[in-house]
Amino acid sequence: MGESGPVVIDPRRHDAVLFGVGDALGSALASQLGQIGVGTAAFAADGPAAAADRLRVRPGRCVVVAGDPAAVEAARTAGFALVIGLAPVGRDGDGLRGAGADAVVAELEQITVRTGDRRMSQLPDASQALTGGADGLAGRHPAVFFDFDGTLSDIVDDPDAARPVAGATAALTRLAARCPVAVLSGRDLADVTKRVGVLGIWYAGSHGFELTAPDGSHHQNDDAAAAIPVLAQAAGRLRDELGAIPGVVVEHKRFGVAVHYRNAARDRVGEVAAAVRAAGRHDALRVTTGREVIELRPDLDWDKGKTLHWVIEHLRRSGSGALTPVYLGDDITDEDAFDAVRGGPVQGVPILVRHNDDGDRATAALFALDSPARAAEFTERLADQLERGEG
């Protein structure tokens, strides 16, 4: 996050905010956080990591606000998700930046809070989206987008062992005969294409930096391609730095470096996150997080949501007519697509595939399914509906 951009606390990504400054717990910011279910606490000499332990929250899903470079550095070393330096007017913030602050503000009022989302447990079942009504699909022509891991496939300890759940590929094949279908994954394009193996659909890899159309034509983000050698170097350094930690896997992809820590000891996760964030700062790469993974990618304003809009626009120019976007995903990176589906020219249907990895976090989705198996069943039912001419 650059200092020139907005500083946002997002309950989809952040479970708590830890303050190391003055009477911040009595501030309007702290009050607003409490209203949306984001925890708050103060820390002192024992540091932010101890405060996170007391709140029983993970540093990787917490924000630290501190005015002391030592506290900023401690938060950075512990792997906190967002570290905000507070430098009142007249005070130089360079020391906070040098200690690793993601952003520096002059007052708490410069920090904004995302509101309006619901918790995962509050979402109605996606079967309701198959009906009519403002949010339903009856009588509409959909374009359906899927994440892979955690949506079409169960999350497994070994990412290389992931496969579509029973019935998923058959349902995708039937659906693709009736409407545009796309799989948008953080995996490499070749990897996700091979794992799904359904012909006649769109595939996007690396969160949309590279994709193929149903006719086999290939598209890539050329600005992102400039970062390929930098990512390769970062992957090598992270393997050297983290390779001795049991359970950590450094996965080098064409447009990214994913560091998986699902099988690592919990007391090593902060160390892993800190190393990846340091690599991102060193090489000017963007850091994103997911379910037991932290990733480096090109620092460009591109994500699954923008990829979805690009595909919809491509289909429109090809004469598809009005399309209602539907997106099924489970992870934090899928929230960009949920935002895109809700904020596009046509109100779409964002569907979260629920899990327990991040607790009952907030989401921009409007509907939910309880597992990849339920996502496959939903896909089958939608294909049935379209085959009957009810779409």
Curated annotation (Swiss-Prot):
GO terms for biological process: trehalose biosynthetic process. GO terms for molecular function: metal ion binding; trehalose-phosphatase activity. Pfam families: Trehalose_PPase. It comes from Mycolicibacterium paratuberculosis (strain ATCC BAA-968 / K-10) (Mycobacterium paratuberculosis). Its EC number is 3.1.3.12. Pathway: Glycan biosynthesis; trehalose biosynthesis. Mg(2+) binds at D147, D149, D330. The gene is otsB. This is Trehalose-phosphate phosphatase.
